[in-house]
């Protein structure tokens, strides 16, 4: 977008300036004081320079020596995976964990530690008990599955036996019937009946 041109407000109007600021003679007349006025003894005010003065308190400036980095000096990098013996820092504990050497404080700390240890121990015991219960449930489930499988196998065998048994029974019954018929034919004598 094209920026809008801002119109100067009252472009044709003139600014009103006092002669004191514009005319040197008028300024000098103001600076002149007469003995008849109250401010005759006062010295004319001096204008303050608004330029900031350096805060060196009159001391000469000393240039700081430039500190060069290792890259600029071309120093090879140390192997940071292995700390040199002299450069190891002393191990520090956590901040704010230093207690006063008082018997009461030590006693309190020991009591609190015992409570925490007992809580942790009870948690461990609970975890062990839960493990035992889980194992027992697992064993029960495995037993049930084994029993179900055994029942299924028995039923399969029974079904096979019955299907085989039915056909064998039928054959045996037929054989028995045939034998009976044959025996019946051989043993039976024709009886003759005579009428008188």
Curated annotation (Swiss-Prot):
<protein>
    <recommendedName>
        <fullName>60S ribosomal subunit assembly/export protein LOC1</fullName>
    </recommendedName>
</protein>
<feature type="region of interest" description="Disordered">
    <location>
        <begin position="140"/>
        <end position="196"/>
    </location>
</feature>
<feature type="coiled-coil region">
    <location>
        <begin position="121"/>
        <end position="167"/>
    </location>
</feature>
<dbReference type="GO" id="GO:0140691">
    <property type="term" value="F:RNA folding chaperone"/>
</dbReference>
<keyword id="KW-0539">Nucleus</keyword>
<dbReference type="GO" id="GO:0008298">
    <property type="term" value="P:intracellular mRNA localization"/>
</dbReference>
<feature type="compositionally biased region" description="Basic residues">
    <location>
        <begin position="187"/>
        <end position="196"/>
    </location>
</feature>
<dbReference type="GO" id="GO:0003729">
    <property type="term" value="F:mRNA binding"/>
</dbReference>
<comment type="subunit">
    <text>Component of the 66S pre-ribosomal particle.</text>
</comment>
<dbReference type="GO" id="GO:0000472">
    <property type="term" value="P:endonucleolytic cleavage to generate mature 5'-end of SSU-rRNA from (SSU-rRNA, 5.8S rRNA, LSU-rRNA)"/>
</dbReference>
<feature type="compositionally biased region" description="Basic and acidic residues">
    <location>
        <begin position="140"/>
        <end position="156"/>
    </location>
</feature>
<comment type="function">
    <text>Required for efficient assembly and nuclear export of the 60S ribosomal subunit.</text>
</comment>
<keyword id="KW-0175">Coiled coil</keyword>
<feature type="compositionally biased region" description="Basic and acidic residues">
    <location>
        <begin position="166"/>
        <end position="186"/>
    </location>
</feature>
<dbReference type="GO" id="GO:0042802">
    <property type="term" value="F:identical protein binding"/>
</dbReference>
<keyword id="KW-0690">Ribosome biogenesis</keyword>
<dbReference type="GO" id="GO:0017148">
    <property type="term" value="P:negative regulation of translation"/>
</dbReference>
<dbReference type="GO" id="GO:0043022">
    <property type="term" value="F:ribosome binding"/>
</dbReference>
<dbReference type="GO" id="GO:0042273">
    <property type="term" value="P:ribosomal large subunit biogenesis"/>
</dbReference>
<dbReference type="InterPro" id="IPR037650">
    <property type="entry name" value="Loc1"/>
</dbReference>
<dbReference type="GO" id="GO:0051028">
    <property type="term" value="P:mRNA transport"/>
</dbReference>
<comment type="similarity">
    <text>Belongs to the LOC1 family.</text>
</comment>
<dbReference type="GO" id="GO:0033592">
    <property type="term" value="F:RNA strand annealing activity"/>
</dbReference>
<feature type="region of interest" description="Disordered">
    <location>
        <begin position="1"/>
        <end position="65"/>
    </location>
</feature>
<dbReference type="GO" id="GO:0000447">
    <property type="term" value="P:endonucleolytic cleavage in ITS1 to separate SSU-rRNA from 5.8S rRNA and LSU-rRNA from tricistronic rRNA transcript (SSU-rRNA, 5.8S rRNA, LSU-rRNA)"/>
</dbReference>
<keyword id="KW-0509">mRNA transport</keyword>
<dbReference type="GO" id="GO:0005730">
    <property type="term" value="C:nucleolus"/>
</dbReference>
<keyword id="KW-0813">Transport</keyword>
<dbReference type="GO" id="GO:0000055">
    <property type="term" value="P:ribosomal large subunit export from nucleus"/>
</dbReference>
<feature type="compositionally biased region" description="Basic and acidic residues">
    <location>
        <begin position="8"/>
        <end position="26"/>
    </location>
</feature>
<dbReference type="GO" id="GO:0101031">
    <property type="term" value="C:protein folding chaperone complex"/>
</dbReference>
<dbReference type="GO" id="GO:0030687">
    <property type="term" value="C:preribosome, large subunit precursor"/>
</dbReference>
<dbReference type="GO" id="GO:0000480">
    <property type="term" value="P:endonucleolytic cleavage in 5'-ETS of tricistronic rRNA transcript (SSU-rRNA, 5.8S rRNA, LSU-rRNA)"/>
</dbReference>
<feature type="compositionally biased region" description="Polar residues">
    <location>
        <begin position="30"/>
        <end position="42"/>
    </location>
</feature>
